[in-house]
């Protein structure tokens, strides 16, 4: 966001999200944190968050989100309603309208220049250094958009692990179909991951074979980790 120029405003939407907003205000470079606190933002559905972003999009030249499952679900909706092209998974910023993104499963890099008035972008966060927390940004409350009631969350499964989260891990031990079975996967890879303090990952083939759950999957069809 800093490389794109201009003031940086951070949107926090949730239910009882004051603590999250205060934490966001400490991020270096952020000038204003805008907070929409309403019950229908608790489950972070893309439909409701899209309506909120569109209602507050006026005056912004760039709208960014991480290239996570969340961002990939949200930002295409935003781009479509603004009638602009989304720029996906950028790994570099050349100027305010020119960005670098991987193509062909990461085997090449494309430099993309956007002529749209508003740039809607997802960011591959592992390509950028984390900012420090030496800031006290202004926190403003904004009105919540109406509940679209288009989607209802019926269930959420939380996977708990003492290992690092895949998307943020510095070291990942990953295995594929060649391990032969889920038992071999755990027997061979877990001790190594324990020694290295690493996260565990797996190929799509290993996940499809049932060796591990799909939240272990890394790569083009899983979590992007490099």
Predicted regions and their residues:
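N-terminal glycine-rich FAD/FM-binding segment characteristic of electron-transfer flavoproteins
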Residues: 2-226
